[in-house]
């Protein structure tokens, strides 16, 4: 299919872009000590530029030390400028154009700051300090020009400082920058725009990121006010508006990094309504993962350009594959947000990752060819085993995948049974097709035994046999009636009825609850000894409250099931007096979703050890965990063969 609109050129001031695709600024966490740029961040951007992206926007850069969170780059001195030059050089060498997102975070939570920095106690900005910040935006713009960027973006969305000035409930001021009028609320942003323009060449475009809708705050900027501001911003020197959605002060956070719960293009009606009333190009943001949708939105005049973010994290060749009619080869984002968001807020994570692309942020390593091609036995055709085989083949090895069941897919097929998660099933089926396309044999219906390993004599073995259900040790559970396993429910082998209790509030338990609601079971309670939504990730947990408000799905946290009787459970919890109390609760159906346990693998690893065959155990076969851990293990194992 041809996507002529998507891949048509567009000119912003003096900059001509070869297509309408923008890689938006996204936090990668690849910043080093002293704001240094290593080899990883330039390689990350070079991969997307070489993949055909029209404009790469480098993530948030802080304009001053006071707002410099350790997660982000800075751009307020010449050292920063010289470090960022590494990124622009890499993008240009790969045939792309480079933009940078210039930022002041405003009310940034304390936990985002490096504790070694001594930060002043937050206080009301004086007018003098506001003027200094305006100048600092201008100086960052000057440094960005010197660093070789082709375009600049002023970040004014997501309750960062510019948004805080514009929003009538966040702006508490009573002076000329206060909330008495729209002109006052917009004054700071317009001053920043003019100051940045003064420090930029006449032919260099200035973009601005805004929210297409201000929401879930005590008071909001209306659409009429947003349109008025955009028109003022255009007069002040903004050449295109990048319309996003979401804020860090409410449940609207979910719109900033939209998970699979939101439909692709969920923000486009808001954007189109604004575009119809402004006279500068509009960049549309809103979980666009399909080139056909992106092209359609541009053809229909709803947007002029499209931000393709997470889709290009999952596949840096998204643009080239789309343009060349190879859409079926695109490794698609599934909207899990486990790597691109959860790893951002995980202090242990060194950088973002991706379930579908475990090489994300590791592009600089390439795919080194081995001195000798090895015959590798991959045991298990789930998400981990298939991914390992793909990377092995790409490097030049000869993998063969063995699967005990009659079809590939593993637990990712079941994961796709929950509402709005079809992309998970599609992803693992894509992996199976990709293996076939690459010439990798998948032998189904074959259980690998130590004897088979001895017979085949592979050079290397990767065990990816996954995990299986093991019933929890609860008195009475083994004899109770109307007890089901979540795995069987999702597979369609069983359907609970009536008043249903789900034991286990992790991802499987919560998604089973969603599955049951979708299939007409109206009385569902999820119980967990810790919290409901455990290990689901922050954004997907938030969607439990958004999509299933109130008592739609009842939630009981801190509840430990101590016994199961005749359609009755006994559970213990700690009351407000901090005393342990036991109670009983009736059920018509009880669903066990307490998690999985790794399948036994010692017979396989022992056989490999006896034969002197190197062996790696990966994913849930090593430790029952999330899909993102399985694919990360798969990549690491494949790279080490």
Per-segment meaning from a language model:
Residues 254-260, 304-305, 413-420, 618-623:
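Short beta-alpha connecting loops at secondary-structure transitions
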Residues 401-437, 491, 513-561:
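Rossmann-like dinucleotide-binding cores of NAD(P)H-dependent redox enzymes
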Residues 1-379, 383, 388-394, 399, ...:
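Flavin-dependent oxidoreductase catalytic cores
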Residues 193, 363-371, 381, 387, ...:
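Flanking helices and flexible, charged tails adjoining ferredoxin-like Fe-S electron-transfer domains
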